[in-house]
């Protein structure tokens, strides 16, 4: 199959630094190639260039991985689907203009949607009026070979909060937790709130640091007030770490597993409760590292693509909902 993937166009693919969507696109493209498919990555902000590149490649399927470009959907003459990675897609009242700029376009165009979670698909069904036959669950995957793995972590007594430090991730709420360490670039929205002089702030990790050092921590913490299907959780699992997330970060995780902990939103300001939950999860995670590494295989990109993306692409190509 010949597949075109459209990226945001603002950061190179693969990215040199941070860029979750760009990493996802790159790793997905490499897995597709390993499965025998031809892949074109289009990464430009010029809509005319996008359409021209698609037509030149003449793909069997087009996957728009940046929801702002849903407006191009009617102009793409090939079977197509759109994915949103917007962190507040399930909380449109917090959208900051997203609803009018992007979501209402979905309601008008009613494209095929590759949604990252069941909750996201429900939003498109109930609020955008997109028919169920146009909605497909397609979780993100991860490249399992990227991360170093150890059964004896150097910092097993520490938890790592690995994310851009901003208002959505809320890191400043948890800085008094002594065993919680933070890595990520600081967004202006957190300046004055997040104490970057703290010994627990590790600065912004390079890709090499991320791939080499993540496995040396006991577990991952991600307590955002909005997420879609966060890549960092799968990266943590692939490095052998359990995860502590909010209700917004639990998409596609097996909540029956002891090393996956969900903090209820109504308890997010109870720092003592959060700290105890993080420590308890860390202790369980250290005892279950082999099991975590085995579970992470469920998110291997080749497995995810074969189970979800390729069958749904074929259904759309066959005319079920073009």
Annotate each predicted stretch with a short phrase:
Residues 225:
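Aromatic "clamp/platform" in nucleotide-sugar-dependent glycosyltransferases that forms part
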């Amino acid at each position: 199959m010949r597949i075109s993937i459209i990226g945001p166009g603002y950061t190179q693919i693969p990215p040199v630094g941070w860029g979750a969507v760009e990493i996802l696109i790159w790793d997905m493209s490499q897995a597709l190639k390993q499965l025998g498919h031809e892949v074109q990555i289009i990464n430009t902000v010029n809509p005319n260039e996008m359409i021209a590149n698609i037509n030149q490649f003449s793909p069997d399927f087009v996957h728009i991985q940046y929801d702002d470009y849903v407006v191009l959907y009617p102009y793409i003459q090939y079977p197509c689907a759109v994915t949103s990675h917007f962190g507040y897609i399930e909380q449109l009242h917090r959208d900051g203009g997203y609803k009018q700029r992007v979501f209402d376009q979905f309601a008008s165009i009613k494209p095929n949607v590759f949604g990252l979670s069941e909750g996201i698909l429900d939003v498109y069904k109930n609020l955008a009026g997109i028919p169920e036959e146009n909605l497909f669950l397609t979780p993100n995957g991860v490249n399992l070979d990227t991360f170093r793995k150890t059964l004896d972590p150097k910092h097993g007594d520490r938890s790592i909060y690995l994310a851009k430090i901003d208002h959505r991730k809320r890191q400043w709420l948890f800085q008094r937790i002594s065993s919680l360490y933070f890595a990520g670039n600081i967004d202006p929205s957190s300046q004055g709130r997040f104490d970057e002089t703290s010994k627990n702030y590790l600065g912004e990790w390079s890709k090499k640091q991320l791939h080499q050092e993540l496995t040396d921590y006991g577990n991952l913490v991600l307590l955002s007030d909005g997420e879609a299907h966060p890549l960092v959780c799968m990266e943590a699992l692939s490095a052998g770490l359990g995860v502590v997330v909010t209700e917004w970060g639990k998409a596609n995780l097996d909540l029956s597993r002891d090393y996956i902990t969900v903090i209820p939103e109504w308890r997010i300001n109870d720092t003592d409760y959060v700290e105890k939950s993080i420590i308890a999860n860390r202790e369980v995670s250290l005892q279950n590292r082999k099991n975590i590494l085995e579970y992470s295989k469920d998110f291997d990109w080749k497995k995810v693509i074969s189970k979800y993306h390729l069958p749904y692409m074929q259904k759309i190509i066959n005319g079920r909902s073009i």
